[in-house]
């Protein structure tokens, strides 16, 4: 009986999500106001970069993406950090396995389960654009994080793997559509020192660098960076720019 109830609830949720998807699906208007080449010199260590996806491999992938982005009024589904080192720009990010550009990115283990990677920024933009036709956005940090501090804070995450996707989707669903407090409590219960999400990595590193304040890292979703309330979790001596959307023209 309990199993039937659970199955019924899942079916109702899936049907509801599909209805919301078809009712709200709209073509994304290209609203980028900058070109990458015009803002390239502004990037520095500690900037937060966001990625969106406009092309999906399957309808199921599109529904999953919709449920954690457009359903809550967001456009971006992935987040990473910028590193400027010796005039070169890199994205430091936590991704699943075979993320766009993985063939040229540097990873720190070969477990085949994703994790932290380093990739040149322009390569990441080019590969992401090729696979997903995405657009991008950045928040520029007011004061660059010294590279020695940045390296020290990211190195402890090198051998972790990407978080379980079912767990990730469950936390996202509860946080966005049910109750934030419940999701926060579950995130604490589910906490695993060996696994991370992209947002969790970004928040943990910036928090360790004293750039942003405490927040449940496991449920630090990309849309939070896009949200106007983002400034509420900044340290008093650090600020970030408004969200700057941009396109990359290879």
Swiss-Prot record:
It is found in: Membrane. Signal peptide: none annotated. GO terms for cellular component: membrane. InterPro entries: Papain-like_cys_pep_sf (IPR038765). It comes from the Viruses. SUPFAM superfamilies: Cysteine proteinases. It is a single-pass membrane protein. The chain crosses the membrane at residues 2-22. Its main location: membrane. The keyword rRNA processing does not apply. Keywords: Membrane, Transmembrane, Transmembrane helix. This is Uncharacterized protein R372.
């Amino acid at each position: 009986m309990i199993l039937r109830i659970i199955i019924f609830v899942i079916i109702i949720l899936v049907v509801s999500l599909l209805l919301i998807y078809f009712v709200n699906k709209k073509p994304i208007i290209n609203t980028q106001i900058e070109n990458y080449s015009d803002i390239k010199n502004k990037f520095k260590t500690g900037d937060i970069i966001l990625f969106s996806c406009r092309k999906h491999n399957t309808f199921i992938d599109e529904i999953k993406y919709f449920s954690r982005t457009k359903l809550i009024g967001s456009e971006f589904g992935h987040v990473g950090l910028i590193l400027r080192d010796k005039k070169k720009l890199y994205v430091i990010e936590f991704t699943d396995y075979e993320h766009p550009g993985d063939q040229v990115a540097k990873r720190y283990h070969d477990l085949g389960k994703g994790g932290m990677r380093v990739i040149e920024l322009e390569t990441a933009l080019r590969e992401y654009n090729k696979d997903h036709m995405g657009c991008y956005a950045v928040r520029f940090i007011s004061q660059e994080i010294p590279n020695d501090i940045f390296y020290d804070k990211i190195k402890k995450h090198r051998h972790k793997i990407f978080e379980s996707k079912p767990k990730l989707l469950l936390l996202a669903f509860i946080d966005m559509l049910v109750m934030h407090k419940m999701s926060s409590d579950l995130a604490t219960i589910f906490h695993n020192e060996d696994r991370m999400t992209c947002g969790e990595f970004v928040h943990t590193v910036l928090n360790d660098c004293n750039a942003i304040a405490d927040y449940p890292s496991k449920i630090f979703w990309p849309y939070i960076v896009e949200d106007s309330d983002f400034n509420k979790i900044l340290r008093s001596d650090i600020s970030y720019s408004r969200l700057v959307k941009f396109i990359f023209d290879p």
